[in-house]
Curated annotation (Swiss-Prot):
Domain of life: Bacteria
Matching InterPro entries: Endonuclease-V
Annotated protein name in UniProt: Endonuclease V
Record-listed Mg(2+) binding positions: D46, D116
Residues spanning the membrane: none
Coiled coil region boundaries: none
Residues annotated as site: Interaction with target DNA: Y86
Subcellular location: Cytoplasm
Record's function text: DNA repair enzyme involved in the repair of deaminated bases. Selectively cleaves double-stranded DNA at the second phosphodiester bond 3' to a deoxyinosine leaving behind the intact lesion on the nicked DNA.
Gene3D superfamilies according to UniProt: archaeoglobus fulgidus dsm 4304 superfamily
Annotated organism of origin: Bacillus velezensis (strain DSM 23117 / BGSC 10A6 / LMG 26770 / FZB42) (Bacillus amyloliquefaciens subsp. plantarum)
Cofactor: Mg(2+)
Length: 238
């Protein structure tokens, strides 16, 4: 898959991160470039981390499925040492090198990418799902398992029905949705990434839900795969 190299990762402090984010924020597109009914393939993206000899390592898994049959079409991964320092609010900078490396291995070009993480629902609207979209050139959706509290704003719990949701409003702006994908199970937190609107994100996500998990199928598969890969690499000290 072709990757758009919009910036490098020779970034070492918060001022570098802020400058890079600010150069992209005004380019975020919250209008859909594809209709949910036209989505044929969906990719799930997740990462897992561990320490080895005092050094941080990570693995990224991308799993592509057929949107209709839900069968796996392709899966790729990348593994390596994490070189970008962690700074709160700028996690994407640590994750993107591995995401890009894995995506470059894809033979398929998924119609949409679903990330285990936030997109527009972020302090600067630049969660990993949004930031990664500029490299991938595809619509992206953020799927977070836990709520990122911004400016002290809580979310309203959706009704206990599959598909129920409440919009997350912060200073009068919709950042995302708290979405119930299974009864009697905690909601997930949905947000646009880039080149997609919230309603399309919702429709695509709900089409990817089954009875096995509250997470969309490709995200759940990527999550499971990263745990398997992390165990393998930790055990074999690769």
């Amino acid at each position: 898959m072709k990757i758009h190299q919009i910036h490098d990762f020779d970034l070492n402090d918060e001022s570098d991160f802020i400058r890079t984010q600010q150069s992209l924020i005004h380019k975020i597109n919250l209008s859909p470039v594809i209709h949910p009914d036209s989505v044929n393939t969906c990719a799930g993206v997740d990462l897992a981390y561990w320490e080895q000899d005092g050094e941080p390592y990570g693995v990224c898994s991308i799993i592509v499925i057929d949107a209709d049959t839900k069968e796996v079409i392709e899966k790729v991964h990348s593994m390596g040492k994490i070189s970008v320092p962690y700074v709160s609010g700028f996690l994407a900078f640590r994750e993107l090198p591995l995401i890009i490396e894995a995506a470059e291995k894809l033979e398929a070009e998924p119609d949409v990418f679903l990330f285990d993480g936030n997109g527009y629902l972020h302090y600067n609207h630049m969660g990993v799902a949004t930031h990664a979209a500029f490299f991938l050139g595809k619509p992206t959706i953020g799927i977070a398992k836990t709520y990122l509290k911004i400016k002290g704003c809580d979310f309203e719990m959706p009704e206990n029905e599959v598909g129920a949701y409440t919009d997350i409003l912060i200073d009068g702006e919709v950042y995302g949705r708290a979405l119930r994908t299974r009864r009697d199970v905690k909601p997930i937190f949905l947000s646009c990434g880039h080149n997609i609107d919230l309603e399309s994100s919702y429709q695509i996500t709900m089409k990817m839900i089954n009875r096995d998990s509250r997470l969309p199928i490709p995200v759940r598969l990527a999550d499971l795969e990263t745990h398997v890969l992390r165990t393998f690499y930790r055990k074999n000290h690769v």
